[in-house]
Design a protein with these regions (language model features):
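Catalytic metal-binding/acid-base residues of hydrolase active sites
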Residues: 35, 76, 124, 150-151
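Internal catalytic-core helix/loop-beta-alpha segment
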Residues: 100-149
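Active-site acidic carboxylates
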Residues: 1-113
Length: 152
């Protein structure tokens, strides 16, 4: 797999792609959908994300130690799914993610602290139909470090 990564990087570089722009001065951490519905292997949507959650916990500690903004997202629907739109038709298994259930709560291993935002979303994107963009702009965030298990 390492060879594939190296050849891809070389291919990008030869075409003038893949350069880095660097980091800004006001970063935030966005943790996408590390809720029990996705991190519990017993859940129909779940998998074994122990390694990913552990790495995220380290990132989270660094952001918290630096007193930097941290935002979590979770997918959650009203019990009658009137807020689910066509997405629930596309992905019917999401119907287990009902507001107030344990499955929509953030995994205890990285549980939000008081003052950390939890954005409830209805679709794959953390930005579509949420106030996340406004929240980041209000904090003048210029760099977002994204981790999670259902990012898009």
């Amino acid at each position: 797999m390492n060879d594939w990564h190296e050849s891809t990087r070389a291919d990008y570089a030869s075409k003038g792609l893949g350069s880095r722009s660097g980091y800004g001065v006001k970063p935030a951490l966005l943790i996408v959908d590390f809720s029990n519905g996705f991190t519990d292997p017993a859940s129909p949507l779940g998998g074994d994300f122990d390694q990913q959650v552990a790495v995220t916990a380290r990132l989270l500690t660094g952001f918290r130690d630096g007193k930097l903004p941290v935002v979590f997202t979770t997918v959650a629907y009203e019990p009658d799914f009137r807020d689910a739109g066509v997405f629930i038709k596309k992905v019917p298994s999401l119907s287990i993610l009902v507001q107030g259930s344990r499955l929509v709560e953030i995994d205890d291993r990285i549980a939000p602290l008081e003052g950390e935002s939890v954005i409830i979303k209805k679709y794959a994107s953390s930005f579509f139909g949420t106030d996340l963009d406004t929240y980041f702009k209000g904090l003048e965030v210029d760099t977002v470090v994204i981790t999670g298990c259902t990012t898009s």
